[in-house]
Amino acid sequence: VITNWKKGTTEFECINPNGVSTILGTSAEGEEKIASPKAIMLGSLAVCSGLDVVAILKKMRVELDDFKINTTASLTDEHPRFYNEVTVEYHFFGQDLDKEKIEKAVDLSVTRYCGVMEMFRGFSKVKTEIKYN
């Protein structure tokens, strides 16, 4: 990943090996135009696990109307401030959801497949919850 500072700003452009660009940094006070590095970490955790869950459920032939993940975290009080507790809530929407298969898919992601989840466990207590809607 190549990261370039956008001169005169608090923004950086990150370009991944495929050439896809993402702007990260901090916005001017009162504006929330771009994602912070820590918010991107939480998003990466959710996407990593979400990709696993969707792929596993597809193989299990589980149909969903919708699926979302809410990720919240607490920061330490002292610098360097980092996430010391993270909660990942998996929200599943649909009729006659197969809870057993859904729970198995989430468990496989959390315990076996999601590398970002494993990285987070190195510095944070990670809790997961499953919600059915």
Task: Show the residue positions of the predicted features.
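Extended beta-strand/beta-hairpin segments
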Residues: 1-43, 54-133
